[in-house]
Structure formats: structure tokens, C-alpha cells
Amino acid sequence: MKNRFCRMGKTLLGAACLLSTFGVTYSCSDDYDLPDTKPSFLGQSIYDELNKAGNFKTVIRLIDDLGQTSVLSKTGSKTLFVAPDSAYTEYFRKTDPNFTSLDESYAKLSINQKRMLLNGSMINNAYVLEKLTTIEGPVKNLCLRQTSASSATDSIPYWNWQDLPDNQNKGQKDENGKTVNADMRFWDKLRNEAHGGIYMALDGTNPLLTHFLEAQMNEKKIKNSDISFILNLDGTPEAWDDSETAGTRSYFYDARVVKGKQDVTCLNGYYNVLDKVLVTPSNMAEVIRTNGDTKYFSAMLDRFSAPFFDRSLTDAYKLLNDIAADSVYKKIYIAERSSMTSLTQGPNKESLNDFPFLPFDPGWNQYTVNQSTKEQDMAAMFVPCDEAMANYFVHGGGKVMIERYGDMENNEANLLHNLYQIPLNVIQPLIKNLMKESFNESVPSKYLTIMNDAQDPMFAARQYPSVDAYKANFKKVLLANNGVVYVMKSVISPATYASVMAPVLYDKSTQVVNTVLHADDAYTTDKYTQAPLRKFYSTYLLAMQSSFSFFVPTDEGLKNFGYIDPVAMANTGVKAKHAYWTFEPASVTAKDGKYLAIKAQGYPYDPTKDLDPANTRAKSGYQSLANEDLGNNWAQSKKFMLCEMIDHHILVHDNDDQLGVRGERQYFLSRNGAPVHVKSKGNSAGVGMEVEGGLQIDLKNDDQPANDQNITVSKVYDMTRQTNEYGNGTTYYINRPMQASQNTVYGAMQKQEQFSSFFKLCNDLSSNIGSSMLETLFRTADMKTNADWRKERNKYYIFADNAASSSDNPGARITATQMKLVRFFNAYRYSVYVPNNEAIDKAVHEMHLPTVQSIQAYIDAHTDENKKLDSVAKIKAQAMVVTLVNFLKYHFADQSLFVDQCTATTECQSACSDEETGGFIRLTAEQTPGKLNIVDVTGNTVPVSSSLNNICTREFELNSVATSARYITNSSYVTLHSLGDKFLLFSSKVKGDFAKAWETVGEAKAFAKKYRIKN
């Protein structure tokens, strides 16, 4: 084959060279005399060879009628796939209901039908079959589809108005009688009798020619039996198995190349004889619409479609055809990937910001897989037949949706109407789950690796133990020009319907949370940076191997109570700025931006009262409508608060923790690390459970009982795998949102009298005295600028400066006014174990723990009249500072731990390090029911106070100074515990007496080196 291909190339080259000499075309060969002979393998032109054969008269007629005679009878470069007249006779028997003869049926063909038959079976290049799997590069064995001579203008039908999609969706009525969740009715403008009809292409791109050839099949590990099943050959004499004797075959769509009739060499290319007429099928959406057994699914799919006017298509089609219409439309499915890239508006300029996109356009002829070319792959869809849809929605798992949204009795007679009433965002996960981007990876032999929307096996081995068992689930297979449609006998629910998101998706009382969960759905395959929230919550909550407790504030709670703005509260000195916000579902009509279909309204916050927007005048100017871009003004605050709220209401449990929040434990950490306290458990299902965040705990512990917030679970949905076989947790509806504490570690220590001595030690390091002392001891000659010195100085600080970080003040962090942040905490969860005043007094006066004041006094005592510090004293003073800083930092550790009803041992890292080991110095936390003990590195066990523990705080950094900030850039959630009159030791060296660290200059040097302050 390879030699013959090369031989023809040389022949045509020789012919071209001789043309100018002899005026005719010749080819090179060793066994002929010019100009009377040519190579025996080289025939006449394609046209002449077909004409001479005598049994391709229909093909010849097509060529003649379409004006291609001269093209195919002269030197050129074409490949044709032709069927004999007998095949055309069979073709017309099946397609012409009034068939009498081949000639009569042919005479009925329109010019467009003729174009489709000829152009779809012709490639505008000369290829032998074995080269058709090579793509540009060249890259061998990857090509599945070829660009043929077909064009989108070959057939653009005229559609009567009543044949256009008829969207029967009515939407739902909210409590005020307003229509909500209604479809965008893209077709209504054209679907009216007065308009008459339209010319509309099923897609604006040219269809390709799909082939199943050995080299590509081998490369992609596609079996003969896969193609046999796809072409519906199983059970027929043409069935193709995987045995060694099965032989090789070549198919173009479902037409097979006749053995011995391939690569017939002609002067201007090749032709291949097929066993049937090659007809380019329509796209997947259209074969689903027209096959007669998937009308319910097709109706739902068409709700995502819209007619778009196409000027270039209009002009091109009018050049070929005499039509009176001024406009030609193309049918486009609104999807993340389609021929219309970056689709943000509907055909009438409607905003698509909150439209639930499909993953790809099933009508896209030139469908392209991500990271691939259109020639290498196509799509696959798993579509339930009508009987399966009826069983699912009338009697099965989809019944709940019809009962929730349908407005007629749930029976098969009313099914189509009721299906239309299911909102698009609810039906979209079902459709999306059944759309697979790769044909190559979705063939039957690979069924165990086909994944659902949660990336779990869609066809589990326990249900489908063999390929044959898998195939038995299908009624038939439909081949389209851009993919394969597997028609199923059952409906496969998406993981979305089994996850903790499902109740929220279905429920009209949780639309605010649902909007946030799905805000980024249209950006999951690409364009990640353009997602409005960039949180991708629906993807996160589809982790079906996880176990979630998902707390959902209802729309009523978000409207009637609201959410305190932690950023506004950070401006502690200006009470007039303090605010809380309510959130309500809304519609987006704006275009070309990042929007969220939620209205936010601000109200003044009175810390002595509970939130009561119904009886409070809204703050003037404190509003963000759905049409406000999320990068602007209060929309930034809206985005931040809603994302923070969702993060705080998602809890992830260990997979072996089947009880979750209904178990013995009372304290849990949310997705973002914020604590959730289960105050009471409610009934056996969890209804009546009381929960609270750090803010609610703080409010109940203040002296204002009127401001208390009581949060109660009203509904519980068991979505666990233990109950449902497939699931990932439990969904709890609550009457209002939880919130994290607005206290910082600095503020919490400041408020607790028992912590005042420890707090003073921490704070003194960054005082004027402490800063001056540090400069005396640690500033070196190479620290020429203040920025150089401050970078070094900050290592010894516990609290960072409350200012914007800059080159002149690196390490500074903006937070609430009059507050400071723990310098070395950064977007994680931590605990601080605080010795009380008695413990610090013991450490200082009995064990000689240095303080800033005592170190400064030591420095002063060893500084001469020329203000020169004695070198030995300096080394010892440095060791004193290292001792003090490490003593303090050792009480700051990672992991938020609680005095709780649990038993666990946790290895924690403190904030101080050991230069010799190269790691952070550890401590061990031992939890038993109602107790928490800390074991320090010396082996000393210190119990956490039973009366002062579990103080929830939050370290938060603002995007700007508190007076103008809009959101928090990062947070750490920190739990404070009192150690009573005990403290922790970071080194055995200082056990009994801290002064051991600097008894001699050598010991001071070694100690300062081993425990040097690095960060």
C-alpha cells in the first residue's frame, strides 16, 4: 500500500512536468512508450472510471447535475466513496414511501439533497485509506473524522413556524404571585403564525466525515465489537467480533468499504466502493429529535436551544439558492463550548449570566474535545428512551420533581407538559451527566471508565458485571455526524440528585444558597478565571466519596434576619458604618460582566438587638442589585459575605463517621476552618438541633440578652450512602445563618483579665521599648535601610503592625481598627494555650523568664558611658530574647482543638522551631470526654482549664484600611484555652530555670543558635 501511494505521487509529479511539453498529462513508468502508454495501475479520471464501470450511473448523475463533471474528469485531487446503483435502489426503497423505480425516486431529489449525497462522500484531496488516520503534523493513527466537501449551505431547510421548538414552560409563582424560574423563551418571537417560517441551519459549521479505520481503532483501543454495537450490527450476519479470524474492515459512518474495491487509483485521485449509500447523518441533537423514541429527552434538550441570525450564512445560502427570505438562522445550544465562543447573550441580546449552560453544544457539527482537534474525536450521549423517561418521572426517582414542579396530574399523558415545568437549572444536571465529551473513551469496552458528574463510575461493576450486561441496557445506537447517541432503557440519575445539594436544587425556599452553589457551573471546563465567584461549590459538593453535613439557611431566614457584615464591624470606631445585610433571589438582565442573581440590602446594626430588617429602615446607598458587576462597590461585599457564609456551613466528616453532627462531639470545623458548635442534637433525625458559630456564642456571652441569635434545624434530608446506596451526607435547613466570631486573638486576650500578663509579654515585644531593645541587639551593619531592619525585627514580634504591608514595613497586615493580628498565623486553623496571670508571675519571678523590661534593664546595666554594650552581655541578652520569644510562640500551635465529647490524640506543631532538627517544635494534644491535656516537648502534661476554654476567635486581613475595606482577603480561625496556673516549656534546657539558657556565654551562644528566631 505504501509503495503504491508513493508510486502515484511520482506519477502525478511526472505528469505535471510533461504537461508543458506535450500539452497533455502523462505519468512516469519504465514499461511504456510516450505518449501512447501509462502505468497499468493508473486508470482514467474518477469520472471516466465510474462511467466505464457501468454500475455507478446514479453517482454519475449526481456529478453531472451538480456541475462537477469537469472537476472529476480532469487532473485534480479527490477521494470519493461511491455506492453502486443497486445500493441506491435499496436506499430509495427505505427513504421514498412511494418508491417505484430508481429513476423516479432520483428525480424527486432536490438540488440540496443531491449536494448532501455527493459532497458528503467526497474529500478534496487524494488519500488512500491507510493515510486517512493521519492528521496534520503529521501525526499518525489519531484521525477519526475528515473534512469533506460538505458545507453548511448544502441543505438549509425551511421551517414552518409550528415546527420550531415549542417551549411550554410557565415558571413558578412565588409567595407574592410573581413568576420565577421561567425559561428564556428564545423561540417565541419566531414561533408565531404571522411570521410564517424561517430558513434555519441545524448548525452553522460544516459537517465532517466520520470513519472507523483499523489504525485509529488500534491506537485508541477501540474494539471491533465496539463498532459492531455502535453500528447496530450485533445479532445480524454483519456482526463484527474480536476474534483473530474476524478480519479488518473500514467503515465510513455505517457504510462498509467493499473488499477489493478500495483505493481504486485514477488519474485524479481515488475512489472506494461502499456496500451502501453514504449519507452524512445529522448532528446528535437532531437525531435525538427525529428518531421517534427520544421525544421527551429531545424536548428538554431543546429548551437550551436558540435561533441565532447568521449574516455570512445568509449571504452564502442566497448565492446558491433563490430565496425570498432576508435572514438565515442557525440553531445553537447554549453551552460552555460551541461554535459561538464566549456566548454571553441570547439571540435577542438577553443576558445569559445566570443561564444553566450545557457542557457542549450537541448540535455543533465541528464539535471539538478540549485539548484536541475536531478530527481526533467526537462526543457521546446516553439518552433515555421515552419509556425509560416515563418510568423514571412517573414512577421512579424523578417523581419528586414532577410532584414539586408539575401542575397537572403525574401520568404519562401529562408527562411532556409536566417535564417542561421543571426549571432548567434542575433538569440541567440530568442532561449534563449524560453528555460525554469523548467518543473514543466512551465505547462499550471502556464502560467501567465512563464517569458521572462526580467523576465516579457511571456504570458500576456491581450492576453491570460484564460488557454484555452493559450492552443489554441499550435499545439502539444512533450515529450522528458529531458523535454517537446510545439510547438507553433506563434513566441514570446524576450525582447532583444524590448529593447534599439536591434538596437545595429542588426547593424554592433555598434559592439564594442554590444560586451561590451553581454560580460557577458554566466555567468548569474552561474559562476558570472568568467564573463570577471562582469557588466552584457544586464541583466540591459532588465529592461523593466524602461525607458532608451541609447547613442551609433558608431564603426566609436570609431575608427576615440577614448576615452581619464583618468588614463593616471592623471599623470599630465608627458605629454608623456597622451594618448587616439581607439577601433575596433576583434576576440578572445585564450583559458582559460577572453577576449573581441575588439582591443584597444593607441595614444599620445595633449590637444591643437582634437583626430585624422588617422593622428597620435600610441604610441609604447600601444595596447591590443582581445586575451589579461583582467587581464593583457593594457587590464585592455581597460576593464576599455569601461565599463566606457557604464555606462556614459546609462540614466535612471522616468517612467512618456515619453520625456526623448527630454524634457525641459538639464542636466541628467547617470548610473554611470556622468552628460550628452543636448546642443540642434535636430529635433522632436532627430536626430541632441547635447550632451556632463563634459570633452566636459571643452574643450569648455578652451582657445583652436581646441580641441573642437562636439557630434551629427545621428540616433534615438524609442523603447518605448508608441510606441511599449513593450519597454524600446530610442536608440541614436552618432558620438563619451561622457566623464566625469577630474577635481577634489580640482582642480576646485583651478582654480576658486572666490573660493580661501573657498578653502584655506578647504586646511588649512590639512596643517602643521592645522595638528599641531588639534594634540594639539584632540590627547589624548590613541592614542599611529601615526596611531591611524591620524585616529582621518583625521576626521577634508576636503581633504584626496594623497597616498595609509595604517595602518600608514588610509583614504589616490590615485588620480591624485598634486590633492586631498574630504575625505568623496565615489562613489556617490554630489554637493558643494561654497561661493565666498566676502562671506568668511564677515563670517570671520563680523561674526567671525574661521580660522586655528585664532584658532592657540588663542591657542598661552593661552599657558603658559611651553607650557601648558589653559583648558578652549582648550575647546573653540575645539568648534572653530568644528564650522569651520561643516561650511565647510555643503556646501558639496549629490545629483548632476543643474541650469536647471525644477521644483523640493530635500531634501539633508550635510556632517555634529547633535549628538542629530543622523542624517546628511539637506538642501533643490529648482529648478525652470533657477534657483536653497538652503534653509539651519536655513530657510535662498541662490540663486545659475546665472553666475557661473553647474561646472562638478569627484573625482576618482586610483588602484595605477598615474605613474603606469591602472584603476579607484571608482568615485564620483560632481557639483560645486557658492553661490555668501552668505553662508549657519548649526545651528541657530551661526546665526549672530559664536562666540556664544564658548561664555562660558559650551556653548563651549555643542556645540562641539552636532556637534562633527564623520567621
What is each model feature region?
Residues 5-6, 11-13, 26-1015:
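Mature, structured domains of secreted/extracytosolic soluble proteins
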Residues 15-18:
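Hydrophobic alpha-helical membrane-embedded or membrane-associated segments
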